[in-house]
């Protein structure tokens, strides 16, 4: 299924403004965030940019951000099951500390 991700200004220099991720049915948000972080870290490595404060996760918790799915923050954020065409947005002040 396709999940639309809108990156926050903190991430945009590494991930672009928007991307579409293809994930398996039943994927949870935590798994998608790990995929996103891998993309951010690879881009940071290629551009020689520190990604410590640009990733979505710090260990097994959110890295200072709020994640909205279709306009609202789910209660059990990292365990939330995604659905096709979900729209993910990051709100910083927040992601990356």
Give the predicted meaning of each segment.
Residues 1-96:
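Ubiquitin-like/PB1-type beta-grasp interaction modules and other compact soluble beta-rich domains
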């Amino acid at each position: 299924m396709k999940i639309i991700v809108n990156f926050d200004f903190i991430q945009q220099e590494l991930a672009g403004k928007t991307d579409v991720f293809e994930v398996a049915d039943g994927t949870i948000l935590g798994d998608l965030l790990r995929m996103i972080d891998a993309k951010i870290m690879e881009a940071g490595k290629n551009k020689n940019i520190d990604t410590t404060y640009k990733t979505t996760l710090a260990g097994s918790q959110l890295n200072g951000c709020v994640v909205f799915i279709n306009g609202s923050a789910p209660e059990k954020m990292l365990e939330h099951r995604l659905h096709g065409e979900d729209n993910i947005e990051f709100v910083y002040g927040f992601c990356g500390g």
